[in-house]
Structures are given as C-alpha cells and as structure tokens.
A protein has these predicted regions:
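Residue-level signal for inorganic ion chemistry
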Residues: 33, 106, 151
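Structural beta-sheet core signal
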Residues: 5-7, 50, 116, 145-148
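Conserved core of the sugar-phosphate nucleotidyltransferase
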Residues: 125-190
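N-terminal glycine-rich phosphate-binding loop and ensuing alpha1 helix
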Residues: 2-65, 72-74, 79, 91
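A short, conserved beta-strand element in the Rossmann-like catalytic core
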Residues: 13, 122-124
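Short, electropositive alpha-helical surface patch
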Residues: 59-71, 128-137
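Short beta-strand-to-loop acidic/aromatic patch adjacent to the donor-nucleotide binding site
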Residues: 112-122
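Short phosphate-binding loop-to-helix
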Residues: 68-113
Length: 190
C-alpha cells in the first residue's frame, strides 16, 4: 500500500511577497519543503502529490523535480480558480478556494490513506512519524480520519495576525469541532 503525502503548495504568499515554499532557508539553501519531504520519506511515505498552481508550474518543477524524484514517487496536480466548475465559480474571485478544494485536486491519485501538509509550514519529524503511524493503523483502528494538532502558542507568527483552525477535543483526545479564527496573534505579556 502506497503511503501518500499531499503537499499544498498552490498559493503564493501575499504577505511574504513571493513563493515562500521555494525560498532557501537552510545552510545549503534547503527550503522548508525540503525538510518536510526528507522527514516524510524517512518515516515511510513513498509518494508525494504536490498541489501547485499553473501560474508558477515551471519554476516549481525546476526547483523541486530533480531533488525528489529519485527518492520518492512525485506527482503534480493543479489548483487554480479555473478548476472550479464555471456554474459554481464566482467571476469576481481571484483567490484560491482553500485547503479542502486543494486536496480534492489529488483525489484521482489517491487510493489509500494519505496525509496532508502545507508546503510553507515546518513540521518536526515526530509529526511525520505520528502521521505515518496513525495512517498505517487506520484500517484496524475503527476510525477513518485523524488530525495531528499543535498547541496554539507554538504555531503563531512572531508578529502579525494569522488564520488558525482552533480544535476542540474531548477528554479522550477525539475531535469535537474545528473553528476557523482570523487575526490570531501573539500578545506580549510585558
């Protein structure tokens, strides 16, 4: 059974002003995406589906394809406003339709449990281990999905507001609800 990781990489960071997912940050120019793919492959993922935009397809593939295709199966799907059926499309909308729509772009390539990450977020290896191990256990566990969550204080930007899904869980750790909050920011205790 292939263990697939869907990487959401179609958005261009408006606040950042460019393709944050392709910006080198490591000592040898590694991107956040490089660290994620490395950790995902090390824990057992053997297929990566990148959800990208046709607007930067060539640049993305040039920087990504050669790095990963020799160690993991790589496929691409596209998320653009044009992928919405015309009768359901808002003609005034230029922004992408969100993470769920992005994941649906890859549905024809998925035939087993899969994980989803954002290309611009840093996930520690332990997160990939938790994700992978729970995906392997899904069939026998009696549930169909799960969420790897983080404490809010650990996922806030140093400055400025962000949008976060706030998860409510019960005493057993089961998800009760997710509420989208915008403008969430760190407040100094000084």
């Amino acid at each position: 059974m292939a263990m697939t990781l869907i990487v959401l990489a179609a958005t261009m960071g408006n606040k950042y002003g460019g393709l944050k997912q392709l910006e080198g940050i490591g000592p040898n120019g590694e991107t956040i995406l490089d660290f994620s793919v490395y950790d995902a492959v090390r824990v057992g993922f053997d297929k990566i589906v990148f959800v990208i935009s046709r607007h930067f397809e060539q640049e993305f593939k040039k920087l990504v394809s050669g790095k990963y295709e020799h160690v993991v199966d790589v496929e691409y799907v596209y998320q653009d406003v044009e992928t919405i059926p015309e009768e359901k499309r808002n003609p005034k909308r230029t922004a992408l339709y969100g993470s769920v729509r992005a994941v649906l772009m890859g549905e024809e390539l998925i035939d087993a449990p899969f994980g989803v990450i954002n290309a611009v977020n840093f996930y520690q290896r332990e997160s990939f281990e938790l994700l992978y191990n729970n995906l392997v256990a899904l069939k026998d566990a009696g549930y169909h999905s799960f969420n790897v969550c983080y404490r809010l204080k650990n996922v806030l930007a140093e400055s400025g507001g962000v949008t976060r899904g706030i998860c409510e869980v019960d005493e057993n750790g089961y998800l009760i609800s997710v509420t989208d909050r915008t403008g969430v920011e760190r407040i100094s205790s000084k």
